[in-house]
Amino acid sequence: MSLLTEVETYVLSIVPSGPLKAEIAQRLEDVFAGKNTDLEALMEWLKTRPILSPLTKGILGFVFTLTVPSERGLQRRRFVQNALNGNGDSNNMDRAVKLYRKLKREITFHGAKEVALSYSTGALATCMGLIYNRMGTVTTEVAFGLVCATCEQIADSQHRSHRQMVITTNPLIRHENRMVLASTTAKAMEQMAGSSEQAAEAMEVASQARQMVQAMRTIGTHPSSSAGLKDDLLENLQAYQKRMGVQMQRFK
């Protein structure tokens, strides 16, 4: 796996699924391929994206700044600085300075990532802030190692939280989660269907599923009534793809 592929993988792992994630993935690909060279426009686009947490925006802004060539005098962006200041916690700053000194001695991506993984997310973000604000310099490889370590920690905590929700025994939470997943799957089906004639059927199935979820929420239904809803939708989607000549074995 190339360095940039690895960075893209880690960064995207902390972005919530949805159309915005696909957009961000495209931007990252363009930046890494050298196709997008307007850092100012890129940062303005990032700043106005909804849904993303300030820290995720800060990390993406840091990655864009590392990758896109820019004039030396280009202003640093406040939304990135605020996200990478470790909540103004002096402990985070102390640890970030110690980490920075260690990173100065590293020359490889993996070496930097290993060193960084033993620090808290707050210290890692603050260390990124030091580099972003030009208070310290490390090689791009080392900076990317720091980015990936931070993303790994965030993704770990997101995974723990997600797993807790998946294994919860509360039937109301499970019911709502199944309806949310069915609704987002239906939305994805509508986007993929496009405008071909064969798409009408897929669009109809997706539309019915969304109406069903809406009705279930409106009248209130038994928590077990949503079981299998998303899987039924995915089966329909795969059948539609087969007819279109697209073979995607796993969508779950």
UniProtKB/Swiss-Prot annotation:
Keywords: Host nucleus, Membrane, RNA-binding, Viral matrix protein, Virion
Localization, UniProt: Virion membrane; Host nucleus
SMART domains hit by this protein: Flu_M1_C
Domain of life: Viruses
Short sequence motif named Nuclear localization signal, residue ranges: 101-105
Keyword Membrane: yes
GO cellular component: host cell nucleus; membrane; virion membrane
A molecular-function term among this protein's GO annotations: RNA binding
Membrane topology (UniProt): Peripheral membrane protein
Matches recorded under InterPro entries: Flu_matrix_M1, Flu_matrix_M1_C, Flu_matrix_M1_N, Flu_matrix_M1_N_sub1, Flu_matrix_M1_N_sub2, INFV_M1
Annotated region described as Membrane-binding, given as residue ranges: 1-164
Principal cellular location given in the protein's record: virion
Protein's UniProt keywords contain Membrane: yes
Ranges where the record places region RNP-binding: 165-252
Subunit structure: Homodimer and homomultimer. Interacts with NEP. Binds ribonucleocapsid by both interacting with genomic RNA and NP protein. May interact with HA and NA. Cannot bind NP without genomic RNA.
Anything else known: Most abundant protein in virion. When expressed alone can form virus-like particles in transfected cells.
Protein name: Matrix protein 1
